[in-house]
């Protein structure tokens, strides 16, 4: 159908045939050149322009008045879907601006809803949608935003939308948001006074002003974390200490503008009610530790990591100040000031100390451990990692002098440990309270050391011996043969010299109580171990035989166990001898499985994997 458009641009056309012949319709006929129509392009195309929606013609003030009078949250959510403009306008309406005479559900919500945005999904637009959508559905109580660094699209506008629509907010986590500043945090503080937990990580735009706003408005704040916020300094901590009397836990990490003045003022002001203090990689000296030791009357958990400016005197004063009467847990990592003298002082000054963890404390030796054992009579667990000055004699001295309450001992990556001389006579006191023993990646630890521990520890339930090339069947047997109670968890991963004999002995002696057995990377483990487990173990529910020599026959032995194994987790990853022939047996075991690892099993085909995925739908399968 053809038509002639009027010059005015209206889309009216003459129906029917054309008034003129088309130049191409009659070949061979001469036509004079037509004159070009003097019609402007804008005039011609103006007829195709969409007319503006009538409601968009309204001034924004009028549209604001209309939207704030919507009678229900459901209608507000529906209107938010009309356009981004409407969504942004709705999200800018605070609860105080809503017309209460026409709204029935603007009462303060309970705040039980939780929302999390990560990476590219974290935008101002999504925050606006969350603010509008959750306001009528119980109220948002927890918000977690993980940005993507300088590519993050979350700004103060998005936080303002949340502040206006979510007054019931109690938990806020802002991570890696460089575009967020004090303006957005202040909006949250003023509009969400019920905040109890605040986590700020890698937000360089937030300074002391933002923390001051939090302190002035959020008096219920009980948990504060500040991590890698370069704009936050001592003044912000002072404001928190003055106003937030309900603060119970504080964690500060990698904030270069925070020093002794801020930390000391905080602990002096809030030490009587702060229970958890975590200081990591800060420019502080022994003064801060002295204040903690003097004023930290309520502190029960103390973490000190990477405090390079603290010397031995700082730890000595902290312990001898006698103020940490309630301290139960102490973790020290990469602090050059932690020495034998400091460790002894802490043990003497903290009578209720139960858990101690020392990591990369290179100046702590066996002398310090013995002093700790003699002074900290309530000690229940000790964890040592990369403390290379500790040797086997320090270990022996600690175990000989530790109190009757020690339940767990862990040693990892301590290169100063060497094996005892098998011909030397060793004392044989009892450490009957020890229930958990973990020795990991200590190259010098061998059979003689295990024999020594076997003389001390008769009540072990959880044994972890990992990456110990010097340990053989004889050493493990010496450790376990004097055990008076049944083992519950055994981890022998990466002990390449442990064989089927050890597994057989464990299954015979402790088969009725054993629940977890990890043999990952034990190169000498074969089907005989699985036969022993199937025959003697009744309660095992977690079995890891990854990277061993087991084959289809071993899996068949497990599936046909007379004890009807109730396995929940089975790991056979990296077992190249297991093939498709084990499919039926794995399916039989899968009746109770919740987790199955068949990664790097090269002889299990994709069709078998598909069958397992289809039939074991309750099980989480790694393939």
From Swiss-Prot:
The lineage of its organism: Eukaryota, Viridiplantae, Streptophyta, Embryophyta, Tracheophyta. PANTHER family: EIN3-BINDING F-BOX PROTEIN 2, PARTNER OF PAIRED, ISOFORM B-RELATED. One of its GO terms (biological process) is ethylene-activated signaling pathway. Part of a SCF (SKP1-cullin-F-box) protein ligase complex. Interacts with CUL1, SKP1A/ASK1, SKP1B/ASK2, EIN3, and EIL1. Keywords: Ethylene signaling pathway, Leucine-rich repeat, Nucleus, Repeat, Ubl conjugation pathway. Transmembrane segments: none annotated. InterPro entries: F-box-like_dom_sf, F-box_dom, Leu-rich_rpt, Leu-rich_rpt_Cys-con_subtyp, LRR_dom_sf. Pfam families: F-box, LRR_6. GO terms for cellular component: nucleus; SCF ubiquitin ligase complex. Component of SCF(EBF1) E3 ubiquitin ligase complexes, which may mediate the ubiquitination and subsequent proteasomal degradation of target proteins (probably including EIN3 and EIL1). Regulator of the ethylene signaling cascade by modulating the stability of EIN3 and EIL1 proteins. Its main location: nucleus. Ubiquitous. Residues 52-106 form the F-box domain. This is EIN3-binding F-box protein 2. SMART domains: FBOX, LRR_CC. LRR repeats lie at residues 119-147, 151-176, 177-202, 203-228, 229-254, 255-281, 307-334, 335-360, 361-386, 387-413, 414-441, 442-467, 468-494, 495-521, 522-547, 548-574, 575-600, 601-623. Induction: EIN3-dependent induction by ethylene. Pathway: Protein modification; protein ubiquitination. It is found in: Nucleus.
């Amino acid at each position: 159908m053809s038509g002639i458009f009027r010059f005015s641009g209206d889309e009216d056309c003459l129906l029917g045939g054309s008034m003129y012949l088309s130049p191409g319709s009659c070949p061979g006929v001469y036509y004079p050149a037509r004159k070009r129509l003097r019609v402007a392009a804008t005039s011609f195309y103006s007829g195709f322009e969409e007319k503006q929606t009538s409601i968009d013609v309204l001034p924004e003030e009028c549209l604001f008045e209309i939207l704030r009078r919507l009678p229900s949250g459901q209608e507000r959510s529906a209107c938010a879907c009309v356009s981004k403009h409407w969504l942004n306008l709705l999200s800018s309406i605070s609860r105080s601006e809503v017309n209460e005479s026409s709204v029935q559900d603007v009462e303060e919500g309970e705040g039980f809803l939780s929302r999390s945005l990560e990476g590219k999904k974290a935008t101002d637009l999504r925050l606006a949608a969350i603010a509008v959508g959750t306001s009528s559905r119980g109220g948002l109580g927890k918000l977690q935003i993980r940005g993507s660094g300088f590519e993050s699209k979350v700004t103060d506008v998005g936080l303002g939308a949340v502040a206006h629509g979510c007054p019931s907010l109690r938990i806020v986590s802002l991570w890696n948001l460089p575009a967020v500043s004090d303006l957005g945090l202040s909006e949250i503080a003023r509009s969400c006074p019920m905040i109890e937990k605040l986590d700020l990580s890698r937000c360089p735009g937030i300074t002391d002003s933002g923390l001051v706003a939090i302190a002035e408005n959020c008096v219920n704040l009980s948990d504060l974390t500040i991590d890698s916020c370069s704009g936050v300094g001592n003044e912000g901590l002072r404001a928190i200490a003055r106003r937030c009397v309900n603060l119970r836990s504080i964690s500060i990490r990698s904030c270069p503008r925070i020093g002794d003045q801020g930390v000391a003022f905080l602990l002096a002001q809030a030490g009587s009610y702060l229970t958890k203090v975590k200081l990591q990689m800060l420019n502080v000296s022994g003064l801060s530790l002295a204040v903690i030791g003097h004023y930290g009357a309520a502190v029960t958990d103390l973490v000190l990591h990477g405090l390079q400016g603290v010397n031995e005197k700082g730890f000595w004063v902290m312990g001898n100040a006698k103020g940490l009467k309630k301290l139960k847990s102490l973790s020290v990592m990469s602090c050059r000031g932690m020495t034998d003298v400091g460790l002894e002082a802490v043990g003497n000054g903290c009578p209720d100390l139960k858990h101690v963890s020392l990591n990369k404390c290179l100046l702590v030796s066996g002398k310090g451990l013995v002093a700790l054992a003699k002074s900290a009579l309530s000690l229940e667990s000790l964890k040592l990692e990369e403390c290379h000055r500790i040797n086997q004699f320090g270990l022996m001295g600690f175990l000989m002098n530790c109190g009757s309450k020690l339940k767990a001992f862990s040693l990892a990556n301590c290169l100063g440990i060497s094996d005892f001389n098998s011909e030397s006579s060793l004392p044989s006191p009892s450490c009957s309270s020890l229930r958990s023993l973990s020795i990991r990646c200590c190259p010098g630890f061998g059979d003689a050391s295990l024999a020594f521990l076997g003389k001390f520890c008769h009540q072990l339930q959880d044994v972890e011996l990992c990456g110990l090339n010097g340990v053989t069947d004889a050493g493990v047997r010496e450790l376990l043969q004097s055990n008076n109670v049944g083992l519950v968890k055994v981890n022998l991963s990466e002990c390449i010299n442990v064989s089927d004999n050890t597994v057989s002995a464990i299954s015979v002696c402790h088969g009725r109580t054993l629940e977890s057995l990890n043999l990952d990377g034990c190169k000498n483990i074969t089907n005989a171990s699985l036969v022993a487990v199937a025959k003697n173990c009744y309660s095992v529910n977690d079995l890891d035989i990854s990277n061993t020599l087991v084959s289809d026959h071993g899996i068949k032995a497990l599936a046909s166990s007379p004890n009807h194994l109730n396995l929940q987790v089975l790991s056979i990853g990296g077992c190249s001898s297991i093939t498709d022939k084990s499919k039926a047996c794995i399916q039989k075991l899968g009746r109770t499985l919740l987790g199955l690892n068949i990664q790097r099993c090269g002889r299990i085909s994709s069709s078998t994997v598909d069958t397992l995925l289809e039939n074991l739908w309750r099980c989480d399968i790694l393939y």
